[in-house]
């Protein structure tokens, strides 16, 4: 066996079954384009043998896919026909179930014959509250279990065929059953309508009997709407008006002031309270301006305003001249010092001479 170089692993076998037909065709097109390049094929050591092998494999896989696809297309209309028949059978089953449910509803509505519409409605409400009916569905048979005895009328019973039977035989049987059920429902509906009688509302006997039979109706009293309850509660417990918001006032002080106002103080006490509030504001907050150190603004005539402007301009020019002279002196290093041309000796001479004059005057 020839030893492979280190780090080299043989390529894994390609699984063409996982790839789609479009991917296989794309690979086939690329391999054929490589095979048509003669210069590239001549440079290969195997002269394009691997490429030709892969092309053959791809063609075989594509042909196999096409064959499988053709077989599935042959069975496509059969599957569509089966689906349509299955849908038709399910529709027939649902129609039968609806007819049976309507039949059962008509049976339960005819528990008490020859009674008024009010009695029928009250019996429906009591039957829903006291004796609820239970419907049990087993296969295609339905049984009605109620708290009281119920007169059930004959209804068509449906039996299902085996799933292995043909659909063509199943459809006409169901259609005949549906027709029978619809005719029985119509006849039942007509009989129930004939049994119902409209009673006169002026007769007090039937109303009394209906109320005696159903005491739950007497206990029901008309309830007040919610907004009426809220209005009555608000009238009994009135809410005080909200206090106005005041700046720079603590909530406790505001509550105290509101309580004092409600008690009804004298005008003198209210003035005292205002004075204290102002003093508190002046001491604590900076909401007020400081007292003025100068007189407030005054109206001046045109002559006075011109004189003030000229004076201000002169002062400004003098200040500018002083600043310019100071800057020039600093730039030229000129230092202004006291000048004494006689020096210190002249001063001393004068002082000594004065002493001599004093001595001579003493001797005299």
Swiss-Prot record:
Query: Which keywords does the record carry?
Result: Coiled coil, DNA-directed RNA polymerase, Nucleus, Phosphoprotein, Transcription
MF (Gene Ontology): RNA polymerase II complex binding; transcription elongation factor activity
Composition-biased stretches (Acidic residues): 354-364
Tell me the InterPro entries matching this sequence: GRINL1 (IPR026213), Tuftelin_GRINL1A/MYZAP/CCD68 (IPR051375)
Family of the protein in this entry = Belongs to the GRINL1 family.
* Ranges where the record places region Interaction with Pol II: 223-294, 311-336
**Residue spans crossing the bilayer:** none
* Modification comment: Dephosphorylated at Ser-266 by the PNUTS-PP1 complex, promoting RNA polymerase II transcription pause-release.
Q: What does this protein do?
A: Appears to be a stable component of the Pol II(G) complex form of RNA polymerase II (Pol II). Pol II synthesizes mRNA precursors and many functional non-coding RNAs and is the central component of the basal RNA polymerase II transcription machinery. May play a role in the Mediator complex-dependent regulation of transcription activation. Acts as a negative regulator of transcriptional activation; this repression is relieved by the Mediator complex, which restores Pol II(G) activator-dependent transcription to a level equivalent to that of Pol II.
Which positions are tagged coiled coil?
Answer: 15-39, 297-331
Is-annotated flag, keyword Repeat? no
Its localization reads: Nucleus
What's one GO-annotated cellular component? Answer: RNA polymerase II, core complex
- Region Important for transcription repressor activity: list its residue ranges: 29-68, 295-310
What biological-process terms (Gene Ontology) are attached? maintenance of ER location; transcription elongation by RNA polymerase II
Q: What's the subunit arrangement here?
A: Component of the Pol II(G) complex, which contains the RNA polymerase II (Pol II) core complex subunits and POLR2M isoform 1. Pol II(G) appears to be an abundant form of Pol II.
Q: Which gene encodes it?
A: Polr2m
Note down the stretches annotated as region Disordered.
1-23, 121-142, 200-223, 235-278, 335-364
List the protein's name: DNA-directed RNA polymerase II subunit GRINL1A
Segments of skewed composition (Polar residues)? 121-133, 249-258
Q: Which residue positions does Phosphoserine occur at?
A: 266
Recorded hits in PANTHER family, A to Z, give: DNA-DIRECTED RNA POLYMERASE II SUBUNIT GRINL1A, GDOWN1
Species this protein is from: Rattus norvegicus
């Amino acid at each position: 066996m020839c030893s492979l170089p280190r780090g080299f692993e043989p390529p894994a076998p390609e699984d063409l079954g996982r790839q789609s037909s479009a991917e296989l065709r794309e690979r086939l097109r690329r391999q054929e384009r490589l095979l048509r390049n003669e210069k590239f094929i001549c440079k290969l050591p195997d002269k394009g043998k691997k490429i030709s092998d892969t092309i053959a494999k791809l063609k075989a896989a594509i042909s196999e896919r096409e064959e499988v696809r053709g077989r599935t297309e042959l069975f496509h209309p059969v599957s569509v026909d089966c689906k349509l028949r299955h849908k038709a059978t399910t529709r027939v089953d649902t129609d039968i179930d609806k007819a049976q449910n309507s039949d059962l509803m008509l049976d339960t509505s005819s528990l008490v014959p020859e009674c008024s519409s009010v009695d029928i409605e009250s019996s429906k409400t009591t039957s829903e509250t006291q004796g609820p009916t239970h419907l049990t569905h087993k296969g295609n048979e339905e049984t009605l279990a109620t708290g009281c005895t119920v007169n059930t009328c004959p209804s068509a019973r449906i039996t299902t065929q085996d799933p292995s039977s043909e659909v063509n035989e199943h459809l006409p049987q169901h259609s005949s059953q549906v027709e029978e059920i619809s005719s029985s429902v119509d006849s039942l509906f007509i009989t129930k309508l004939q049994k119902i009688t409209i009673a006169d509302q002026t007769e007090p006997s039937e109303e009394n009997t209906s109320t005696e039979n159903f005491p739950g109706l007497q206990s029901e009293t008309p309830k007040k709407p919610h907004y009426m309850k809220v209005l009555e509660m608000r009238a009994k417990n009135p809410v005080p008006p909200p206090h106005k918001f005041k700046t720079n006032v603590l909530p406790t002080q505001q509550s105290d002031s509101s309580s004092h106002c409600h008690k009804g103080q004298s005008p003198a006490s209210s003035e005292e309270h205002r004075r204290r509030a102002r003093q508190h504001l002046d001491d604590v907050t900076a909401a007020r301006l400081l007292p003025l150190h100068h007189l407030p603004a005054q109206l001046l005539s045109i002559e006075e305003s011109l004189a003030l402007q000229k004076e201000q301009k002169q002062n400004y020019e003098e200040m500018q001249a002083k600043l310019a002279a100071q800057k020039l002196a600093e730039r030229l290093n000129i230092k202004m010092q006291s000048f004494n041309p006689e020096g210190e000796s002249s001063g001393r001479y004068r002082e000594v001479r004065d002493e001599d004059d004093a001595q001579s005057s003493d001797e005299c």
